[in-house]
Amino acid sequence: MSGKEKILLAYSGGLDTSCILKWLLEKGYEVICFMADVGQEEDFVAAREKALRVGAKDVIIKDMKRIFVEKFVWPAIQMGLVYEDRYLLGTSLARPCISIGLMESAAEHSCSIISHGATGKGNDQIRFELSCYALDPKIKVIAPWRLPEFCERFQGRKDLLDYAQKHGIPVSATPKAPWSMDANIMHISYESGILENPAKAAPEELYQMTQSVMKSSNTPIKVDITFKEGLPVTVLEHSGGKTLETPLEVLTFLNKIGGEQGVGRVDLVENRFLGLKSRGVYETPGATILHVAHKDMEVYCLDREIFRVKSFLALKMADYVYNGFWYSPEAEYVRTCLVGAQKNVSGKVTLEIFKGHVIAIARESTKTIYNQELASMDVHGTLSPYAATGFIEVNAMRLKEHYRVFGSANME
């Protein structure tokens, strides 16, 4: 039996983690590599062969697509999570999901240490490590890109390439794209390289999930999305009568039709947890469609004040997820409140998807407090128009008293 300490390395198959794998082996560790399939286009067979050739003891490849969609993406849609009004948290949600597989595999293979290739400036190091510590407080972490010894040896990509050549680590012959990319079934994110200049538009060839609206069909796509307690249940495509029911099928289908219509492209500068601002470009077609539909159903079904309190809590929850606190007491508490607010968010929303836009055009629910007769401008109904006089007088009292004391409002 080997006396070497065992490390589980979160492995991507790329240059960085392949060099980290070899470096850990040089340090005397026995290394097992872990890869999570969360829907990214990846040649897992080739990555496995590469890791074994470099010297990994074993390579674990875990299919986590269903868990990712059902336990992370769907709850995020249900809670209405958006970071800084635009980012639907595709990468942020994947990290705690991957951490589950990482920690399960660490336990199965008796690894007391994990390692990863996240850089010291990004959010992923925080998300991975906070999630892993929450799932197993005893776990130890080796983060090479935060170790002086590693950083001094590898100043940049050239040093990594030289190291790979020296140790026979296979390097892709395909020229490296001038940006980095992270993909899963929910989205693709792009950053760094030429994207670090916010004044320069991202090139069209960058996008992989969506096509330009200039090339998209001139025929709108119409779908019905049904929700139960805030969770997507089914999608019906009007033109073909096709119905999708499982979360994985629903998201895959919406990604396809949303991508064809150029839905879900976002180019932004965001605030990282470390305090840095970072430029990111995202493609999130299917989740964008679901988010628009869910927001429409929420406003239709929820009491006004519940909706406003829920919206405030969703902002807090989005911050927690972005910053790596999916597993935290505060997130557990807020999640309970947000899910509780969704008990009446059930019904059907009809959407038109066209040229980058997602428009809710009709909705139905047995849970809404919408009263057509009460709201109608054509009949008085049970709400007497005379009652508004007292309502206005009471609300005007505060304004009258304020401006009586401090002078009339400035008309400019």
From Swiss-Prot:
EC number(s) reported in the record: 6.3.4.5
Organism annotation: Aedes aegypti
UniProt name for this protein: Argininosuccinate synthase
Keyword list, A-Z: Amino-acid biosynthesis, Arginine biosynthesis, ATP-binding, Ligase, Nucleotide-binding, Urea cycle
Subunit structure: Homotetramer.
PROSITE patterns in the record: ARGININOSUCCIN_SYN_1, ARGININOSUCCIN_SYN_2
Binding site for L-aspartate: 119, 123-124
GO MF terms, alphabetically ordered: argininosuccinate synthase activity; ATP binding
UniProt family annotation: Belongs to the argininosuccinate synthase family.
Domain of life: Eukaryota
Keyword Glycosyltransferase: no
Any one GO BP annotation for this protein: argininosuccinate metabolic process
Pfam families: Arginosuc_syn_C, Arginosuc_synth
Residues noted as binding ATP in the record, renumbered to the chain: 10-18, 36, 115-123
Catalytic reaction list: L-citrulline + L-aspartate + ATP = 2-(N(omega)-L-arginino)succinate + AMP + diphosphate + H(+)
Biochemical pathway: Amino-acid biosynthesis; L-arginine biosynthesis; L-arginine from L-ornithine and carbamoyl phosphate: step 2/3; Nitrogen metabolism; urea cycle; (N(omega)-L-arginino)succinate from L-aspartate and L-citrulline: step 1/1
Binding site for L-citrulline: 87, 92, 123, 127, 180, 189, 270, 282
